[in-house]
Amino acid sequence: MPGQKIRIRLRAYDHRLLDESAKKIVEVAKQTNAKVSGPIPLPTERSLYVVLRSPLKHKDSREQFEKKVHKRLIDIIEPNSKTIDALMKINLPAGVDVEINL
């Protein structure tokens, strides 16, 4: 498939799981002789939620919760059919969201 590029976006709450998954994908792509660019770390999405601790009074007492979504980007340049087959067979952890664009 000359001239094609596969763009893989990974998202997870745990950055260690994300880095392990990215490493697996890069290793598989390199084993099938495809050119790999990445993993490129993208900005982390950070959401902050503030909740009152008491349902009735004590407005000054609040609890803060934070959610971070870590992201990585991997480009596989000039993939072949072996690369695509190998990528389909990879087992990734349940906490990692994978989005693939051709």
Curated annotation (Swiss-Prot):
PROSITE patterns given in the database record: RIBOSOMAL_S10
Gene3D superfamilies, per database record: Ribosomal protein S10 domain (3.30.70.600)
Gene assigned in the entry: rpsJ
Cross-referenced NCBIfam families: PRK00596.1, rpsJ_bact
UniProt GO cellular component terms: ribonucleoprotein complex; ribosome
HAMAP family per UniProt: Ribosomal_uS10 (MF_00508)
Key words, A-Z: Ribonucleoprotein, Ribosomal protein
InterPro entries from the UniProt entry: Ribosomal_uS10, Ribosomal_uS10_CS, Ribosomal_uS10_dom, Ribosomal_uS10_dom_sf
SUPFAM superfamilies hit by this protein: Ribosomal protein S10
Protein known as: Small ribosomal subunit protein uS10
